[in-house]
Amino acid sequence: MANDPTHQFLVQPIIPIEIGGVDFSFTNASLFMVATVAAASGFLYFATSNRGLIPTRMQSVAEMSYEFIASMLREGAGKKGMVFFPFVFSLFMFVLTANLLGMFPYFFTVTSQIIVTFALACLVIGTVIVYGFYKHGLHFFGIFAPSGVPKALLPLVASIEMISFLSRPISLSVRLFANMLAGHITLKVFAGFVASMGALGALGVGGAVLPLIMTVAMTALEFLVAFLQAYVFAVLTCMYLNDAVHGGH
């Protein structure tokens, strides 16, 4: 199983719990979701607990993260969208921290589980729908009828827009899940190839040099992808929240 590149994504129970025939086991995925929240919360707490005019490195990173998301939200959803800052910031930090933790050996990448990313995506779309109807009532349906569309084409356009809207949780979740899954599998394959070549002795060492270089390069790339995927998730969230804030206007 050690050579199986997909073994790292296997959800395994740590504390088996079954109630009424339903499995509520505390798994490795559960553990690392808790660890992700703890790591992100701990970082922000220690980074801001001793704030000063001359910021420490941790404080600078925390402040840059704050400004980064605030600027993204203002551009994506306008000033009125700033009401969602805690929501978007929390999502960004969770996804980013989960992605980064998954880069360490023997750590579990929770964002490589489609059920986790789909739950996050449904949370985003659910927030858009609830706030949209709360803010605009039935006028929220205006997002499915873009202005300037001829009346003859309105039913077709509205149908397409509605299908596009309902597919957002799928596209948002699959994008994050697929990128993290593919990246980690590729790293595992290259690392396994290096180990296999090295086991051949002196003859294999020479052949392992190129795969080793590729593994190091791809590891650096995966750290970049970890940030980019969190960024894309946050950007798309801001764009979707724009519909809730401004409705069909």
UniProtKB/Swiss-Prot annotation:
Its main location: membrane. The chain crosses the membrane at residues 29-49, 84-104, 114-134, 140-160, 193-213, 216-236. InterPro entries: ATP_synth_F0_asu (IPR000568), ATP_synth_F0_asu_AS (IPR023011), ATP_synth_F0_asu_bact/mt (IPR045083), F0_ATP_A_sf (IPR035908). It comes from the Bacteria. GO terms for cellular component: plasma membrane; proton-transporting ATP synthase complex. F-type ATPases have 2 components, CF(1) - the catalytic core - and CF(0) - the membrane proton channel. CF(1) has five subunits: alpha(3), beta(3), gamma(1), delta(1), epsilon(1). CF(0) has three main subunits: a(1), b(2) and c(9-12). The alpha and beta chains form an alternating ring which encloses part of the gamma chain. CF(1) is attached to CF(0) by a central stalk formed by the gamma and epsilon chains, while a peripheral stalk is formed by the delta and b chains. Key component of the proton channel; it plays a direct role in the translocation of protons across the membrane. This is ATP synthase subunit a. It comes from Agrobacterium fabrum (strain C58 / ATCC 33970) (Agrobacterium tumefaciens (strain C58)). The lineage of its organism: Bacteria, Pseudomonadati, Pseudomonadota, Alphaproteobacteria, Hyphomicrobiales. The gene is atpB.
